Amino acid sequence: PRIGRVHCMENVTGRVRGAKVVRMTVSRRAGRWYASLTVERDAPTVKQAPKAGAVGIDLGVKTLATLSDGTVIENPRCLAASERRLKRAHKALSRKTRGSKRRLKARNKVARIHARIASRRRDLLDKLTTWLAGTYSDISIEDLNVAGMVRNHRLAKAVNDASFAE
Protein backbone atom coordinates (compact mmCIF):
# COMPACT_ATOMS: atom_id res chain seq x y z
CA PRO A 1 0.00 0.00 0.00
CA ARG A 2 1.06 3.55 -0.67
CA ILE A 3 1.74 5.82 2.26
CA GLY A 4 2.95 8.90 0.40
CA ARG A 5 6.07 10.86 1.35
CA VAL A 6 8.36 9.42 4.01
CA HIS A 7 10.66 11.67 6.02
CA CYS A 8 14.21 10.30 6.31
CA MET A 9 17.03 11.50 8.54
CA GLU A 10 19.53 10.98 5.71
CA ASN A 11 19.60 12.92 2.45
CA VAL A 12 18.03 10.35 0.09
CA THR A 13 18.42 12.44 -3.07
CA GLY A 14 22.15 12.77 -2.41
CA ARG A 15 22.37 9.03 -1.79
CA VAL A 16 20.84 8.06 -5.16
CA ARG A 17 22.84 10.72 -7.09
CA GLY A 18 20.38 11.80 -9.75
CA ALA A 19 18.81 8.38 -10.36
CA LYS A 20 15.02 8.03 -10.45
CA VAL A 21 13.53 6.37 -7.35
CA VAL A 22 11.11 3.70 -8.57
CA ARG A 23 10.14 2.12 -5.26
CA MET A 24 10.87 2.50 -1.56
CA THR A 25 10.19 -0.33 0.86
CA VAL A 26 10.06 0.47 4.57
CA SER A 27 10.64 -2.46 6.92
CA ARG A 28 11.34 -3.06 10.58
CA ARG A 29 13.89 -5.61 11.76
CA ALA A 30 15.13 -6.12 15.32
CA GLY A 31 13.33 -2.98 16.52
CA ARG A 32 14.91 -0.70 13.90
CA TRP A 33 13.42 0.86 10.77
CA TYR A 34 15.03 0.43 7.35
CA ALA A 35 14.25 1.95 3.97
CA SER A 36 15.22 0.04 0.83
CA LEU A 37 15.31 2.05 -2.39
CA THR A 38 14.93 0.69 -5.91
CA VAL A 39 16.35 3.17 -8.42
CA GLU A 40 16.57 3.40 -12.19
CA ARG A 41 19.72 4.75 -13.83
CA ASP A 42 22.02 4.24 -16.80
CA ALA A 43 24.57 1.46 -16.55
CA PRO A 44 28.01 2.86 -15.71
CA THR A 45 30.91 2.18 -18.05
CA VAL A 46 33.70 0.58 -16.05
CA LYS A 47 37.14 -0.26 -17.40
CA GLN A 48 38.16 -3.79 -16.47
CA ALA A 49 41.55 -4.03 -14.80
CA PRO A 50 43.66 -7.05 -15.77
CA LYS A 51 42.93 -9.93 -13.41
CA ALA A 52 45.13 -12.68 -12.06
CA GLY A 53 44.57 -16.26 -13.25
CA ALA A 54 42.57 -19.02 -11.62
CA VAL A 55 42.31 -19.70 -7.89
CA GLY A 56 40.88 -22.53 -5.80
CA ILE A 57 39.26 -21.92 -2.42
CA ASP A 58 39.35 -24.36 0.51
CA LEU A 59 36.82 -23.48 3.21
CA GLY A 60 37.61 -24.31 6.82
CA VAL A 61 36.56 -23.75 10.40
CA LYS A 62 39.92 -22.64 11.79
CA THR A 63 40.61 -20.28 8.88
CA LEU A 64 37.60 -19.17 6.86
CA ALA A 65 39.25 -19.76 3.50
CA THR A 66 42.63 -20.75 2.15
CA LEU A 67 43.34 -19.87 -1.46
CA SER A 68 45.44 -22.06 -3.74
CA ASP A 69 48.02 -19.27 -4.06
CA GLY A 70 48.66 -19.45 -0.30
CA THR A 71 46.51 -16.52 0.83
CA VAL A 72 44.76 -17.23 4.14
CA ILE A 73 41.54 -15.44 5.12
CA GLU A 74 41.06 -15.58 8.88
CA ASN A 75 37.73 -16.61 10.39
CA PRO A 76 36.37 -13.64 12.39
CA ARG A 77 34.18 -15.91 14.59
CA CYS A 78 31.34 -13.37 14.75
CA LEU A 79 29.16 -15.48 17.05
CA ALA A 80 31.99 -16.37 19.42
CA ALA A 81 32.87 -12.67 19.79
CA SER A 82 29.31 -11.76 20.83
CA GLU A 83 28.45 -14.98 22.65
CA ARG A 84 28.96 -13.60 26.15
CA ARG A 85 26.74 -10.59 25.47
CA LEU A 86 24.13 -12.82 23.81
CA LYS A 87 24.16 -15.26 26.73
CA ARG A 88 23.60 -12.43 29.21
CA ALA A 89 20.75 -10.97 27.13
CA HIS A 90 19.06 -14.39 26.84
CA LYS A 91 19.36 -14.88 30.60
CA ALA A 92 17.79 -11.46 31.23
CA LEU A 93 15.00 -12.31 28.77
CA SER A 94 14.19 -15.59 30.51
CA ARG A 95 13.73 -13.76 33.82
CA LYS A 96 11.13 -11.32 32.47
CA THR A 97 7.40 -11.91 32.89
CA ARG A 98 5.64 -13.06 29.72
CA GLY A 99 3.63 -10.32 28.03
CA SER A 100 5.38 -7.46 29.86
CA LYS A 101 6.92 -4.38 28.27
CA ARG A 102 10.31 -5.23 29.76
CA ARG A 103 10.18 -8.68 28.16
CA LEU A 104 9.51 -7.01 24.81
CA LYS A 105 12.52 -4.73 25.37
CA ALA A 106 14.68 -7.73 26.31
CA ARG A 107 13.49 -9.61 23.20
CA ASN A 108 14.43 -6.63 21.04
CA LYS A 109 17.87 -6.55 22.67
CA VAL A 110 18.45 -10.24 21.84
CA ALA A 111 17.19 -9.63 18.29
CA ARG A 112 19.56 -6.65 17.90
CA ILE A 113 22.55 -8.76 18.98
CA HIS A 114 21.59 -11.48 16.49
CA ALA A 115 21.10 -8.84 13.77
CA ARG A 116 24.55 -7.38 14.50
CA ILE A 117 26.16 -10.83 14.24
CA ALA A 118 24.36 -11.50 10.94
CA SER A 119 25.36 -8.07 9.64
CA ARG A 120 29.04 -8.67 10.46
CA ARG A 121 28.97 -12.03 8.67
CA ARG A 122 27.20 -10.58 5.63
CA ASP A 123 29.61 -7.64 5.45
CA LEU A 124 32.68 -9.90 5.60
CA LEU A 125 31.34 -12.25 2.93
CA ASP A 126 30.32 -9.34 0.66
CA LYS A 127 33.78 -7.77 0.93
CA LEU A 128 35.51 -11.12 0.42
CA THR A 129 33.48 -12.10 -2.66
CA THR A 130 33.88 -8.62 -4.19
CA TRP A 131 37.65 -8.79 -3.68
CA LEU A 132 37.84 -12.33 -5.13
CA ALA A 133 35.73 -11.41 -8.19
CA GLY A 134 37.82 -8.30 -8.81
CA THR A 135 41.17 -10.04 -8.37
CA TYR A 136 40.79 -13.43 -10.08
CA SER A 137 39.35 -14.37 -13.46
CA ASP A 138 38.45 -18.00 -12.59
CA ILE A 139 37.36 -19.08 -9.11
CA SER A 140 36.79 -22.68 -8.01
CA ILE A 141 35.35 -23.53 -4.61
CA GLU A 142 34.98 -26.91 -2.97
CA ASP A 143 31.53 -28.48 -2.81
CA LEU A 144 30.70 -29.10 0.85
CA ASN A 145 27.87 -31.09 2.40
CA VAL A 146 26.98 -28.30 4.84
CA ALA A 147 23.77 -30.00 6.01
CA GLY A 148 25.77 -33.10 6.93
CA MET A 149 28.43 -31.04 8.70
CA VAL A 150 25.78 -29.24 10.76
CA ARG A 151 24.32 -32.58 11.88
CA ASN A 152 27.61 -33.30 13.66
CA HIS A 153 27.08 -31.67 17.06
CA ARG A 154 30.81 -30.98 17.48
CA LEU A 155 31.06 -29.04 14.21
CA ALA A 156 27.61 -27.46 13.99
CA LYS A 157 28.28 -24.23 15.88
CA ALA A 158 31.60 -23.53 14.15
CA VAL A 159 30.19 -24.31 10.67
CA ASN A 160 27.18 -22.04 11.23
CA ASP A 161 29.42 -19.30 12.64
CA ALA A 162 31.63 -19.47 9.54
CA SER A 163 28.41 -19.30 7.44
CA PHE A 164 29.37 -22.02 4.95
CA ALA A 165 25.76 -22.20 3.73
CA GLU A 166 26.11 -18.75 2.15
Describe every region a protein language model picked out.
Residues 1-2, 12-23, 28-166:
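Positively charged, helix-rich recognition surfaces that bind polyanionic ligands
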Residues 6:
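Extended, low-complexity cationic-aromatic segments
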